[in-house]
A protein has these predicted regions:
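Conserved acetyl-CoA-binding loop-helix of GNAT-fold acetyltransferases
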Residues: 35-40, 46-59, 182-194
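Conserved active-site alpha-helix within GNAT-family acetyltransferase domains
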Residues: 63-67, 73-91
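Conserved beta-strand in the GNAT
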Residues: 5, 11-21, 32-39, 154, ...
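Short loop/turn motifs at secondary-structure junctions and domain boundaries
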Residues: 1, 27-29, 143-149
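Amide-forming acyltransferase catalytic core, primarily the GNAT-like/NAT-type
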Residues: 85-197, 201-205
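Conserved hydrophobic beta-strand within the GNAT/NAT acetyltransferase core sheet
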Residues: 69-72, 202-204
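Short coil/turn motifs at secondary-structure junctions
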Residues: 21-23, 43, 76
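Short loop/turn motifs at secondary-structure junctions
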Residues: 31-34, 65-67, 174, 197-200
């Protein structure tokens, strides 16, 4: 990601981060520019700095050939720059009580980096999904899965690789990525996940 700082009289007055990623959505290649960490020093507000930051981001994305620009934030702030709501965010908490009558059925979690073959299988699985983002080779793929202080896990079925997930730190921990080719494993996975995280449960988003 590229961080850009706006200076006023030699002092930092604003900042934004731009990350450009290549996606494949149902066979269509799309370059997406993601904007984040947009902020202006409280002492410098009301001077048009936010508009300058957004204009700079727009120019950089156009120069990079981005097809889509996305960000998260207050609608009333960013609609002025042409951004509109474009999705829904679902979140819930899974606790051991929710799955107390479901057996793990031989499903378990193990650190993904434990065996190179698991990591290779996870990357191959990711690349087969209908919506993917270019993540590079195995080492880069693992680094991405570790974002937000996450621990990547292999999902095992009777000791064999069956999928992968990434569990981020938190109270409760957060399941931030899950790929299971066989949807029939979801109940057993939920039970194994609840068992792994303990009484705190897990936040799913």
């Amino acid at each position: 990601p590229l961080h850009t700082v706006l200076y006023e009289d030699g002092a930092p007055a604003g900042l934004y981060c731009l990350k450009i990623q290549d996606f494949n959505i149902a066979g269509t290649a799309l370059r997406v520019g993601g904007i984040g960490t947009v902020c202006v020093d409280g002492r410098s507000r009301g001077k048009g700095h936010l508009a300058l930051l957004m204009q700079d981001a727009q120019e950089r994305m156009q120069a990079a050939g981005c097809d889509i620009a996305m960000l998260g934030g207050q609608r009333q702030r960013y609609e002025r720059f042409g951004y509109v709501p474009a999705g829904a965010h679902w979140e819930f908490t899974l606790t051991p009580r929710n799955v107390r009558d479901i057996r793990t059925g031989g499903v378990a979690l193990a650190p993904l980096a434990e065996y190179p073959s698991w990591l290779e299988s996870a990357r191959a699985l990711h690349e087969k999904q209908p919506v993917t983002c270019a993540r590079g080779g195995d080492a880069s793929f693992l680094t991405v899965l570790q974002s937000w202080r996450a621990e990547p896990y292999a999902v095992l079925q009777d000791g064999m690789f069956a999928g992968y997930c990434a569990l981020a730190e938190g109270k409760p921990p957060r399941l931030q990525e899950l790929v299971l080719p066989d949807a029939a494993l979801l109940p057993a996975f939920a039970a194994a996940l609840a068992q792994h995280t303990g009484a705190a449960g897990v936040r799913v988003q």
